[in-house]
Amino acid sequence: MRFLLLFFAVTMNATERLPNIVLLLADDLGYGELGCQGNQEIPTPHIDSIAKNGARFTQGYVTAAFCSASRAGLLTGRYQTRFGYEFNPTGRHNEDPEAGLPLSEKTLADVLVDAGYITGIFGKWHLGGTANYNPIRRGFDEFYGFLHEGHYFVPPPYKGVTTWLRRKTLPGGGSGRWTSSDQKLIYSTHMGNTEPDYDADNPILRAGQPVEEPVYLTDAITRESISFIDRNADVPFFLYVPYNAVHSPLQGADAYMKKFNHIKDIQRRIFAAMLANMDDSVGAILEKLRSKNLEENTVIFFLSDNGGPTRELTSSNAPLRDGKGTVYEGGLRVPFLMQWKGKIPKKQTYKNPVISLDLFATSIALAKAQLKRPLDGVNLIPYLTNQNQGVPHQTLYWRLGNRRAIRHGDWKLLSNPKSGEKQTWELYHLTDDISEQKDLSSRHTDKVDELQSKWNQLNSKMISPIWLPKRK
């Protein structure tokens, strides 16, 4: 009888166990990359399998067109402009005491810890570089990675990789492209600036302690993620894996460079090596979940933090206009995938607009967690299981300094002035013009007025930036 009671208790516990949550975040991966997005040049079978076994969102957005602000929205479930987080700390300004996710904001990890989850982050943080903002003080039980905006995958002297770096001036003077005698180091002036000093005062950390990492960083992040799954397979866990791939610096591991010898453009070949490496890493995480019999009790999200910076990396946003840093579709619409085997239909293409804010709302609903503060996202599960046939969002909003946009239904109004330009508004109908080539603002002035009014109404609920960007 005692054995039967124990067996019953264990069985009930397993049945009622909360689902694990795995959030895989690529860095600077454009909408036009991935096999499941229609690009067959660089095979990505493991990432594609998430779409095959679940849902691919054709209109998946993020809350900002660059790294830090986008992550602030993702991890709080609220438009980051609600709490004044609007820009990107870079270089030494990651250490500014005010340049971090406000301590008043609860992260997804904070909420899930209180719901009984073990939480881990392995990769890039970029939500504050000082001790107050360290992930282990923001709800994460474990952290392995770095705090700033970027990091070398392999530090100088760049062993085992081919490295492409930006330079304002080539070694010896001049512009164009310079290649070392062994063909393993390339400098290019095509961007007109020099590669940031990513690793300065930005060590790899385990919790709060610096460690030396001899392994290519994508592989190291994956190693730590797999270890986390191994050690926590018997409890609900939240695994957040913000890869720094395919963010610069461009560094392709030798084994992956060989796979893409057919790509003649060396810049594109390095990018391909980095993306394929990340795909294999995602595959290793998925395989670990399968080997632990966790796949059917694990919700998996995959998305990018913003659109691709095409000139810098070759990261494609096709067929969308422009890319990272802009409020055109190429800056805000990203690869966006979700899997929960046995719970949401597989091979699903979901065509209504969703946004990264929804991952927070979905996750806390699955965790049966409580949060008093209102969220800007929605639980996606009812929409993917046909319990709710409406649209998750009628209106989406963006503000990035003087760049701003609103999407309402199929209409999008935006202002994307370059430095020194005055504020002007452009209007596009996205169903008819996904590439935003036909500005309809002069023909539909009533629609411009309507959307301006809606943007102003939403913006009135936001606050001014609590800190301003600085350059080194």
Segments from the language model and where they lie:
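Formylglycine-dependent sulfatase
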Residues: 14-426, 430-472
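N-terminal signal peptide c-region/cleavage motif recognized by signal peptidases
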Residues: 9-11
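Sec-dependent signal peptide recognition
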Residues: 1-6
